[in-house]
Amino acid sequence: MFETNPILSKLKEIRERANLLRGYLDYDVKAERLVEVSRELELPDVWNEPERAQALGKERSSLEEVVNTIVELETGCEDIEGLVELAVEESDQETFDDAEVEADALDKVLEKLEFRRMFSGEQDANNSYLDIQSGSGGTEAQDWAEMLMRMYLRWGEAHGYKTEVIEVTDGDVAGIKGCTIKYTGEYAYGWLRTETGVHRLVRKSPFDSSGRRHTSFASAFIYPEIDDNIEIDINPADLRIDTFRASGAGGQHVNKTDSAIRITHEPTGAVVACQADRSQHKNRATAMKLLKAKLYEMEMQKQNSDKQVLEDGKSDIGWGSQIRSYVLDDSRIKDLRTGVENRNTQAVLDGDLDKFLEASLKSGL
């Protein structure tokens, strides 16, 4: 005789949680809108306006994720109940085992959709930029900044985001002084936004012949790509624009050109640079887009009274505003805000950040 109570209770709980999400995620409104968008995309002249068609396609994907998943949860519960009934009637252990496996898989689908509730911010669904700056500490800090660049690139690639190094500045001996990475894909900003702050590395330095422990700092600053229809008022008189020859430790990630652009916004001290293209005109346009996005994020953080490190606060790259500590000799990486630890330091440096990201998002940082 099979013990059916646990699996039937689990299915009841899945139904209840899915029903809560129905309300929270506006299922009925989204289902109706999905029908409208799908009809519009079937019109023969929709591609006469390519930008609108692309926006509709993106909207449809986002709507389908919610609508189709809730339908999958509801039909999945019915199907699994049918399997349990069949297993009991036929005294079939294999069918009952299959039902338990499918119930576990359905629970994971539900968890993934529940996690979307974390992405309720206005810009969470957007593409994202990530700036990394080395702190004081010379070569050791610059090497640490490059390690962070590699870590965040690996994370993005593992999650299916298109990553592009827009700008990178070589360190004096090794590593990098700073870089800007762009992540293209849904919820890139939502996933990364809690990473803004100072990252502290403690290790025996490979650049110190006596093998002493060194502490280094580097800062990360995350900001969303913003729509062109968001008005950001920038006075051209407030800008200092420099051109320079691109250099970088980005390897295949970055073009070597004579057309790199750096823009400094004098009132805030915000600095952006772009060397991704061989065209100075395109680099300038990208840099202006970066500047608008960065000023938008700085204003949002100011409005939220956020004490995170901002671009005009590089002196804060030290003990005060740390978010995570990477102590390699003790094999311990700890998030100082959530208390989450991971002792597999190599995996984290290879981009395994989800444990930290999920904890910080769930805690509402």
Swiss-Prot record:
Q: Which SMART domains match?
A: PCRF (SM00937)
The record's keywords, sorted A to Z, are: Cytoplasm, Methylation, Protein biosynthesis
Q: Which residues carry this modification: N5-methylglutamine?
A: 252
Q: Which InterPro entries match?
A: PCRF (IPR005139), Pep_chain_release_fac_I (IPR000352), Pep_chain_release_fac_I_sf (IPR045853), PrfB (IPR004374)
Q: Which cysteines are joined by disulfide bonds?
A: none
List GO molecular-function terms, semicolon-separated: translation release factor activity, codon specific
Quote the PTM field: Methylated by PrmC. Methylation increases the termination efficiency of RF2.
The protein's role, per its UniProt record: Peptide chain release factor 2 directs the termination of translation in response to the peptide chain termination codons UGA and UAA.
Homology family: Belongs to the prokaryotic/mitochondrial release factor family.
Protein name according to UniProt: Peptide chain release factor 2
Q: Please report the organism this UniProt entry assigns to the protein.
A: Colwellia psychrerythraea (strain 34H / ATCC BAA-681)
- Encoding gene per record: prfB
